[in-house]
């Protein structure tokens, strides 16, 4: 049985026309208006794409640096040695190490948001796949987190980089800021994400690519977007 939503959610839902597709600016304004969380809630966009995720070339994955950040301070760790470790520290990484950092995570430590590694560290980091993989923390070249340019990777992560990937049903969900952000900043972040998703369209896709898009705050109801207003 589906869980019944509370009164605050129901009151918020009454303000949303479920049959309407809202212009991007209006949708952001509405999500901000109907948010009822007692904290600065995250705002997320969800796209449903016309892709066949059984085909490797139609599985989208990547990273986006949002122009206005996410509103969240990211704890960043880097697996690196020597000069690369020094570069990571100078770029502002919170924790830098090699085998010692691997062992720390094997012992159960997971107090971080982004993990970055140099390619030479991946044989050791690969042992953490069962721990980091399910949490979306495993370094990956597609998201720019397996790289020799650790300084840039750290800077991007600290600046508000978000990652995206399709689930098996072709959905992509990406956070793009906080309810407290100005509408203009949320809209700019949202349009940046939409632009990246559109450019990542697989060549094999025919017909409509983005079938549906909506935004919502952490606990709030979703608001459907008019895709022609991006």
Curated annotation (Swiss-Prot):
Gene Ontology molecular function: rRNA binding; structural constituent of ribosome; tRNA binding
Pfam families attached to this UniProt entry = Ribosomal_L1
The protein's superkingdom reads Bacteria
CDD domains per the UniProt record, alphabetical: Ribosomal_L1
Biological process according to GO: regulation of translation; translation
Cited InterPro entries? Ribosom_uL1_bac-type, Ribosomal_uL1, Ribosomal_uL1-like, Ribosomal_uL1/biogenesis, Ribosomal_uL1_3-a/b-sand, Ribosomal_uL1_CS
Can you quote a single GO CC term?
Answer: large ribosomal subunit
Kindly state which keywords UniProt assigns to this record, in alphabetical order.
Repressor, Ribonucleoprotein, Ribosomal protein, RNA-binding, rRNA-binding, Translation regulation, tRNA-binding
Cited NCBIfam families: rplA_bact
Instruction: Tell me how this protein assembles.
Output: Part of the 50S ribosomal subunit.
What family is it from? Belongs to the universal ribosomal protein uL1 family.
- So what does this one do? Binds directly to 23S rRNA. The L1 stalk is quite mobile in the ribosome, and is involved in E site tRNA release. Protein L1 is also a translational repressor protein, it controls the translation of the L11 operon by binding to its mRNA.
- This chain belongs to the protein called Large ribosomal subunit protein uL1
Protein species of origin:
Limosilactobacillus fermentum (strain NBRC 3956 / LMG 18251)
């Amino acid at each position: 049985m589906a869980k019944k939503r509370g009164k605050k959610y129901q009151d918020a839902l009454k303000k949303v026309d479920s049959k309407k597709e809202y212009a991007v600016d209006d949708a952001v304004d509405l999500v901000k208006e109907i948010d009822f969380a007692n904290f600065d809630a995250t705002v997320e966009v969800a796209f449903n794409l016309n892709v066949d995720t059984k085909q490797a070339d139609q599985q989208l994955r990547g990273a986006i640096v949002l122009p206005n950040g996410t509103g969240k301070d990211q704890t960043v760790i880097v697996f690196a040695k020597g000069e690369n470790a020094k570069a990571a520290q100078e770029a502002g990484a919170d924790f830098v190490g090699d085998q010692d950092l691997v062992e720390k995570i094997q012992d159960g430590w997971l107090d971080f948001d982004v993990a970055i590694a140099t390619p030479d560290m991946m044989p050791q980091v690969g042992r953490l796949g069962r721990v980091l993989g399910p949490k979306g923390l495993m370094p990956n070249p597609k998201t720019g987190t397996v790289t020799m340019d650790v300084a840039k990777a750290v800077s991007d992560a600290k600046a508000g980089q978000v990652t995206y990937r399709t689930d098996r049903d072709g959905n992509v969900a990406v956070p793009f800021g906080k309810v407290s952000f100005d509408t203009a900043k949320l809209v700019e972040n949202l349009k940046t994400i939409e632009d990246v998703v559109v450019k990542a369209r697989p060549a094999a896709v025919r017909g409509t690519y983005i079938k549906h898009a909506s935004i919502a705050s952490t606990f709030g109801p979703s608001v459907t977007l008019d895709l022609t207003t991006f």
